[in-house]
Amino acid sequence: MNEYELLDSGHGRKLERFGKVTLDRPCAQAVWNPSHPAVWKQADAFFTRKQGLEWRGRERLPDSWIAEVNGVRMKLSTTDFGHLGVFPETRAMWDWIRESVTQASHARREPLNFLNLFAYSGGATLAAAQGGAHCCHVDASKGMVQWARENAALNNLAEHPIRWIVDDVNKFLTREIKRGRRYDAVLLDPPSFGRGKGGELYKIEHALLETLELVEKVMSDQPAFVYLTSHTPGFTPIVLKNLIQQLLGQGQLDCGEMLLTGSDSTFAVPSGTWARWEVSQKSNRF
Protein backbone atom coordinates (compact mmCIF):
# COMPACT_ATOMS: atom_id res chain seq x y z
CA MET A 1 0.00 0.00 0.00
CA ASN A 2 1.16 3.55 -0.71
CA GLU A 3 -0.29 6.73 0.81
CA TYR A 4 2.25 9.11 -0.73
CA GLU A 5 1.60 11.10 -3.89
CA LEU A 6 3.30 13.98 -5.66
CA LEU A 7 0.29 16.10 -6.65
CA ASP A 8 2.15 18.82 -8.57
CA SER A 9 5.35 20.86 -8.76
CA GLY A 10 6.54 24.14 -10.22
CA HIS A 11 7.62 27.70 -9.45
CA GLY A 12 10.21 26.28 -7.04
CA ARG A 13 7.64 24.34 -4.99
CA LYS A 14 6.24 20.81 -4.64
CA LEU A 15 2.80 19.73 -3.45
CA GLU A 16 2.70 16.30 -1.83
CA ARG A 17 0.15 14.16 -0.05
CA PHE A 18 1.33 12.08 2.90
CA GLY A 19 -1.68 10.06 3.99
CA LYS A 20 -4.27 12.51 5.29
CA VAL A 21 -1.95 15.55 5.14
CA THR A 22 -1.11 17.63 2.05
CA LEU A 23 1.95 19.88 2.21
CA ASP A 24 3.42 22.66 0.04
CA ARG A 25 7.23 22.81 0.41
CA PRO A 26 10.23 24.35 -1.41
CA CYS A 27 11.71 22.48 -4.38
CA ALA A 28 14.50 24.46 -6.03
CA GLN A 29 14.76 22.18 -9.05
CA ALA A 30 11.07 22.61 -9.99
CA VAL A 31 11.76 25.58 -12.29
CA TRP A 32 8.81 24.84 -14.61
CA ASN A 33 5.22 26.06 -14.33
CA PRO A 34 2.75 24.06 -12.23
CA SER A 35 0.68 21.57 -14.23
CA HIS A 36 -2.43 21.76 -12.02
CA PRO A 37 -2.73 25.25 -10.46
CA ALA A 38 -6.09 24.57 -8.81
CA VAL A 39 -4.84 21.60 -6.78
CA TRP A 40 -2.49 23.76 -4.69
CA LYS A 41 -5.48 25.01 -2.68
CA GLN A 42 -5.56 21.57 -1.04
CA ALA A 43 -2.40 22.30 0.99
CA ASP A 44 -2.91 21.95 4.74
CA ALA A 45 0.37 23.74 5.51
CA PHE A 46 3.13 25.65 3.73
CA PHE A 47 6.86 25.74 4.47
CA THR A 48 9.07 28.65 3.43
CA ARG A 49 12.75 29.56 3.68
CA LYS A 50 12.41 33.14 2.39
CA GLN A 51 12.58 34.84 5.79
CA GLY A 52 14.10 32.17 7.95
CA LEU A 53 12.58 28.72 8.30
CA GLU A 54 8.84 28.87 8.86
CA TRP A 55 5.77 26.63 8.66
CA ARG A 56 2.49 28.37 7.91
CA GLY A 57 -0.60 26.45 8.94
CA ARG A 58 1.39 24.09 11.15
CA GLU A 59 -1.14 24.59 13.95
CA ARG A 60 -3.73 22.82 11.79
CA LEU A 61 -1.62 19.66 11.61
CA PRO A 62 -1.40 16.83 14.14
CA ASP A 63 1.84 16.62 16.10
CA SER A 64 2.47 13.37 14.25
CA TRP A 65 0.57 11.05 11.96
CA ILE A 66 1.04 7.71 10.20
CA ALA A 67 1.33 7.19 6.45
CA GLU A 68 2.19 4.00 4.60
CA VAL A 69 4.85 4.55 1.94
CA ASN A 70 5.41 1.64 -0.44
CA GLY A 71 4.50 -0.94 2.15
CA VAL A 72 6.29 0.67 5.11
CA ARG A 73 4.25 2.44 7.80
CA MET A 74 6.05 5.63 8.86
CA LYS A 75 5.49 8.08 11.67
CA LEU A 76 5.61 11.59 10.19
CA SER A 77 6.00 14.95 11.89
CA THR A 78 6.83 18.44 10.64
CA THR A 79 10.34 19.41 11.74
CA ASP A 80 11.70 22.94 12.04
CA PHE A 81 13.83 22.35 8.92
CA GLY A 82 10.85 21.42 6.76
CA HIS A 83 11.46 17.67 6.85
CA LEU A 84 8.93 15.04 7.86
CA GLY A 85 10.83 11.87 8.74
CA VAL A 86 10.73 10.37 5.25
CA PHE A 87 12.31 11.17 1.89
CA PRO A 88 9.79 9.73 -0.59
CA GLU A 89 12.26 9.81 -3.47
CA THR A 90 13.84 6.73 -1.86
CA ARG A 91 10.67 4.63 -1.95
CA ALA A 92 11.54 2.90 -5.25
CA MET A 93 14.82 1.90 -3.63
CA TRP A 94 12.93 0.37 -0.70
CA ASP A 95 11.01 -1.81 -3.15
CA TRP A 96 14.22 -2.90 -4.86
CA ILE A 97 15.92 -3.70 -1.54
CA ARG A 98 12.93 -5.68 -0.24
CA GLU A 99 12.75 -7.76 -3.42
CA SER A 100 16.51 -8.27 -3.72
CA VAL A 101 16.87 -9.30 -0.08
CA THR A 102 13.97 -11.73 -0.40
CA GLN A 103 15.44 -13.35 -3.51
CA ALA A 104 18.97 -13.55 -2.13
CA SER A 105 17.81 -14.97 1.21
CA HIS A 106 15.77 -17.65 -0.54
CA ALA A 107 18.67 -18.53 -2.84
CA ARG A 108 21.09 -18.83 0.08
CA ARG A 109 18.54 -20.45 2.39
CA GLU A 110 19.55 -18.08 5.17
CA PRO A 111 18.88 -14.43 6.04
CA LEU A 112 21.02 -11.76 4.43
CA ASN A 113 23.00 -9.52 6.81
CA PHE A 114 22.03 -5.96 5.82
CA LEU A 115 23.83 -2.80 7.00
CA ASN A 116 22.15 0.62 6.68
CA LEU A 117 24.51 3.57 7.23
CA PHE A 118 23.30 7.16 7.81
CA ALA A 119 20.02 5.32 8.20
CA TYR A 120 17.69 8.20 9.26
CA SER A 121 14.17 7.05 10.18
CA GLY A 122 14.62 3.51 8.93
CA GLY A 123 12.49 3.09 5.82
CA ALA A 124 15.16 1.06 4.03
CA THR A 125 16.01 -0.89 7.19
CA LEU A 126 12.39 -1.93 7.54
CA ALA A 127 12.05 -2.79 3.85
CA ALA A 128 15.08 -5.08 4.21
CA ALA A 129 13.60 -6.59 7.37
CA GLN A 130 10.33 -7.23 5.53
CA GLY A 131 12.41 -9.15 3.01
CA GLY A 132 13.78 -11.31 5.82
CA ALA A 133 17.20 -9.72 6.35
CA HIS A 134 18.94 -9.44 9.69
CA CYS A 135 19.65 -5.72 9.90
CA CYS A 136 22.04 -3.24 11.47
CA HIS A 137 20.80 0.37 11.51
CA VAL A 138 23.42 3.08 12.14
CA ASP A 139 22.85 6.82 12.57
CA ALA A 140 24.66 9.47 14.59
CA SER A 141 21.39 10.98 15.85
CA LYS A 142 19.92 9.34 18.94
CA GLY A 143 16.58 10.98 18.17
CA MET A 144 16.45 9.57 14.64
CA VAL A 145 17.35 6.07 15.82
CA GLN A 146 14.51 6.26 18.35
CA TRP A 147 12.19 7.44 15.56
CA ALA A 148 13.27 4.45 13.46
CA ARG A 149 12.54 2.09 16.35
CA GLU A 150 9.04 3.53 16.61
CA ASN A 151 8.61 2.89 12.89
CA ALA A 152 9.73 -0.70 13.41
CA ALA A 153 6.99 -1.14 16.00
CA LEU A 154 4.42 0.31 13.58
CA ASN A 155 5.38 -2.42 11.11
CA ASN A 156 5.30 -5.26 13.67
CA LEU A 157 9.09 -5.52 13.44
CA ALA A 158 10.00 -4.49 16.99
CA GLU A 159 11.20 -8.04 17.73
CA HIS A 160 12.88 -8.60 14.35
CA PRO A 161 16.69 -9.03 14.44
CA ILE A 162 17.70 -5.37 14.06
CA ARG A 163 20.70 -3.83 15.82
CA TRP A 164 20.05 -0.15 16.56
CA ILE A 165 23.34 1.78 16.70
CA VAL A 166 23.90 5.45 17.57
CA ASP A 167 27.43 6.18 16.36
CA ASP A 168 29.70 7.95 13.92
CA VAL A 169 29.65 5.80 10.78
CA ASN A 170 33.38 5.65 10.11
CA LYS A 171 34.18 4.86 13.75
CA PHE A 172 31.52 2.16 13.77
CA LEU A 173 32.88 0.57 10.59
CA THR A 174 36.42 0.59 11.96
CA ARG A 175 35.25 -1.27 15.07
CA GLU A 176 33.22 -3.77 13.03
CA ILE A 177 36.31 -4.59 10.97
CA LYS A 178 38.30 -5.27 14.15
CA ARG A 179 35.46 -7.41 15.54
CA GLY A 180 35.36 -9.47 12.36
CA ARG A 181 31.70 -8.70 11.64
CA ARG A 182 30.73 -8.88 7.98
CA TYR A 183 27.69 -7.89 5.94
CA ASP A 184 26.21 -9.22 2.72
CA ALA A 185 24.51 -5.98 1.65
CA VAL A 186 25.16 -2.33 2.50
CA LEU A 187 23.20 0.87 1.91
CA LEU A 188 24.69 4.27 2.62
CA ASP A 189 23.13 7.73 2.25
CA PRO A 190 25.88 10.11 3.43
CA PRO A 191 24.96 13.72 4.18
CA SER A 192 26.63 16.66 2.48
CA PHE A 193 27.62 17.82 5.94
CA GLY A 194 27.04 16.31 9.34
CA ARG A 195 28.39 15.59 12.79
CA GLY A 196 28.90 12.24 14.44
CA LYS A 197 27.79 11.12 17.88
CA GLY A 198 30.88 12.71 19.44
CA GLY A 199 30.78 15.85 17.30
CA GLU A 200 32.96 14.38 14.55
CA LEU A 201 32.75 16.48 11.38
CA TYR A 202 31.62 14.72 8.20
CA LYS A 203 32.01 16.47 4.84
CA ILE A 204 31.08 14.22 1.97
CA GLU A 205 33.79 15.43 -0.42
CA HIS A 206 36.50 14.52 2.11
CA ALA A 207 34.99 11.60 4.06
CA LEU A 208 33.04 9.52 1.54
CA LEU A 209 36.02 7.76 -0.02
CA GLU A 210 37.21 6.64 3.43
CA THR A 211 33.69 5.43 4.24
CA LEU A 212 33.55 3.36 1.06
CA GLU A 213 36.99 1.88 1.71
CA LEU A 214 35.75 0.79 5.15
CA VAL A 215 32.55 -0.60 3.64
CA GLU A 216 34.61 -2.78 1.31
CA LYS A 217 36.36 -4.27 4.34
CA VAL A 218 33.11 -5.19 6.13
CA MET A 219 31.64 -6.98 3.12
CA SER A 220 31.26 -10.73 3.43
CA ASP A 221 32.84 -13.18 1.01
CA GLN A 222 29.38 -13.63 -0.54
CA PRO A 223 28.24 -10.04 -1.11
CA ALA A 224 24.86 -9.26 -2.65
CA PHE A 225 24.90 -5.51 -3.25
CA VAL A 226 26.14 -2.06 -2.24
CA TYR A 227 23.73 0.85 -2.72
CA LEU A 228 24.95 4.47 -2.52
CA THR A 229 22.67 7.51 -2.60
CA SER A 230 23.31 11.24 -2.37
CA HIS A 231 21.49 14.56 -2.22
CA THR A 232 24.71 16.58 -2.64
CA PRO A 233 24.89 18.91 -5.68
CA GLY A 234 27.65 17.80 -8.03
CA PHE A 235 27.51 14.17 -6.91
CA THR A 236 25.94 12.98 -10.15
CA PRO A 237 25.01 9.36 -10.89
CA ILE A 238 28.29 8.92 -12.77
CA VAL A 239 30.30 10.28 -9.82
CA LEU A 240 28.69 7.73 -7.50
CA LYS A 241 29.09 4.95 -10.06
CA ASN A 242 32.80 5.74 -10.50
CA LEU A 243 33.36 5.63 -6.74
CA ILE A 244 31.70 2.25 -6.36
CA GLN A 245 33.30 0.75 -9.44
CA GLN A 246 36.79 1.81 -8.39
CA LEU A 247 36.46 0.15 -5.00
CA LEU A 248 34.36 -2.92 -5.78
CA GLY A 249 35.46 -3.74 -9.30
CA GLN A 250 33.66 -6.37 -11.32
CA GLY A 251 29.95 -6.73 -10.90
CA GLN A 252 26.73 -5.33 -12.28
CA LEU A 253 26.70 -1.53 -12.02
CA ASP A 254 23.69 0.76 -12.37
CA CYS A 255 23.10 4.41 -11.56
CA GLY A 256 20.45 7.07 -11.97
CA GLU A 257 18.42 9.83 -10.39
CA MET A 258 16.05 9.50 -7.46
CA LEU A 259 12.66 10.89 -8.45
CA LEU A 260 9.50 12.16 -6.84
CA THR A 261 6.64 10.85 -8.94
CA GLY A 262 2.90 11.24 -9.16
CA SER A 263 0.33 10.68 -11.86
CA ASP A 264 1.22 10.68 -15.55
CA SER A 265 0.01 14.29 -15.76
CA THR A 266 2.64 15.58 -13.32
CA PHE A 267 6.34 16.05 -13.98
CA ALA A 268 8.78 13.75 -12.19
CA VAL A 269 11.05 15.77 -9.89
CA PRO A 270 14.77 14.87 -9.67
CA SER A 271 15.62 14.63 -5.96
CA GLY A 272 19.04 13.04 -5.60
CA THR A 273 21.21 10.41 -7.22
CA TRP A 274 22.05 6.75 -6.74
CA ALA A 275 24.49 4.09 -7.84
CA ARG A 276 24.34 0.38 -7.17
CA TRP A 277 26.78 -2.52 -7.35
CA GLU A 278 25.47 -6.07 -7.49
CA VAL A 279 27.45 -9.25 -7.52
CA SER A 280 27.49 -11.00 -10.88
CA GLN A 281 28.26 -14.62 -11.68
CA LYS A 282 31.51 -13.53 -13.32
CA SER A 283 32.59 -11.40 -10.36
CA ASN A 284 35.44 -12.70 -8.22
CA ARG A 285 36.04 -9.43 -6.41
CA PHE A 286 35.62 -10.93 -2.92
Give, region by region, the residue ranges found by the protein language model:
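Non-catalytic substrate-recognition/targeting regions of SAM-dependent transferases
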Residues: 2-19, 23-88, 95
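Conserved alpha-helix/loop element of class I SAM-dependent methyltransferases that forms part
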Residues: 88-108
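Conserved class I S-adenosyl-L-methionine
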Residues: 110-120
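Short beta->alpha hinge that forms the Motif I/post-I loop of the SAM-binding pocket
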Residues: 119, 139-143, 207
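Conserved SAM-binding loop of SAM-dependent methyltransferases across substrates and taxa
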Residues: 121-135
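S-adenosyl-L-methionine
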Residues: 141-187
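S-adenosylmethionine
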Residues: 169-249
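C-terminal catalytic and target-recognition region of SAM-dependent MTase-like enzymes
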Residues: 223-286
